Amino acid sequence: MWKWILTHCASAFPHLPGCCCCCFLLLFLVSSVPVTCQALGQDMVSPEATNSSSSSFSSPSSAGRHVRSYNHLQGDVRWRKLFSFTKYFLKIEKNGKVSGTKKENCPYSILEITSVEIGVVAVKAINSNYYLAMNKKGKLYGSKEFNNDCKLKERIEENGYNTYASFNWQHNGRQMYVALNGKGAPRRGQKTRRKNTSAHFLPMVVHS
């Protein structure tokens, strides 16, 4: 290409010396450099902007919001055992009594957790057919029929455990939580707080 430019320049201006042709060539090269650099600069900046945009979606604060609450679709069903921070499996016996057990193979601790709406679940003991329920006084009991006492708000806490609060009832504006004390006995909802470890449970998968 440069040979053609030199030849063309010499033929177009035969009366000019060779150094002038070289000057024309130099001016041509200088004028083409900014365009090339500008195009190259755009190519280099574009991927960086894309990566920056992508990283904003995976920021720690964004990830934290996603892992703090469940978004199960209505009708989602899971079989689990709820293992409390106090080292008890929550169970609902055939007479409807709610308590904790140390026995890993207790049939009354196998629970069916069903999402009734976003963030709200129903917990039912498979072998006793009782729903986990909390009345307006904060007492845990087993209910044969699904009612408003059986609706529980399921939440993931910072330590990775779940909490289950009454969906319909509060005490003095405070949430009331499902909880087992250090002896495996249920605690009254009025005495519970979200930060109390007695209200923290690990959902453990039940293998058939």
Swiss-Prot record:
Intracellular or extracellular location(s): Secreted
CDD domains attached to this UniProt entry: beta-trefoil_FGF10
GO MF annotation terms: chemoattractant activity; fibroblast growth factor receptor binding; growth factor activity; heparin binding; type 2 fibroblast growth factor receptor binding
Residues making up the signal peptide according to the UniProt record: 1-37
Record's keyword annotation contains Disulfide bond: no
Domain of life: Eukaryota
Transmembrane segments: none
Residues of this chain annotated as glycosylated in UniProt: 51, 196
SUPFAM superfamilies: Cytokine (SSF50353)
Gene Ontology cellular component terms for the protein in this record: cell surface; cytoplasm; extracellular region; extracellular space; nucleus; plasma membrane
Keyword Signal: yes
SMART domains xref list: FGF
One of the GO biological process terms: positive regulation of Ras protein signal transduction
Keywords attached to this entry: Disease variant, Ectodermal dysplasia, Glycoprotein, Growth factor, Lacrimo-auriculo-dento-digital syndrome, Secreted, Signal
Disease: Aplasia of lacrimal and salivary glands: A rare condition characterized by dry conjunctival mucosae, irritable eyes, epiphora (constant tearing), and xerostomia (dryness of the mouth), which increases risk of dental erosion, dental caries, periodontal disease, and oral infections. ALSG has variable expressivity, and affected individuals may have aplasia or hypoplasia of the lacrimal, parotid, submandibular, and sublingual glands and absence of the lacrimal puncta. Lacrimo-auriculo-dento-digital syndrome 3: A form of lacrimo-auriculo-dento-digital syndrome, an autosomal dominant disease characterized by aplastic/hypoplastic lacrimal and salivary glands and ducts, cup-shaped ears, hearing loss, hypodontia and enamel hypoplasia, and distal limb segments anomalies. In addition to these cardinal features, facial dysmorphism, malformations of the kidney and respiratory system and abnormal genitalia have been reported. Craniosynostosis and severe syndactyly are not observed.
Family according to the record: Belongs to the heparin-binding growth factors family.
Subunit structure as annotated in this protein's UniProt entry: Interacts with FGFR1 and FGFR2. Interacts with FGFBP1.
PANTHER family referenced in this protein's UniProt entry, alphabetically: FIBROBLAST GROWTH FACTOR (PTHR11486)
Function (record text): Plays an important role in the regulation of embryonic development, cell proliferation and cell differentiation. Required for normal branching morphogenesis. May play a role in wound healing.
Name listed for the protein in its UniProt record: Fibroblast growth factor 10
Protein's organism: Homo sapiens (Human)
Organism ancestry: Eukaryota, Metazoa, Chordata, Craniata, Vertebrata
Gene responsible for this protein: FGF10
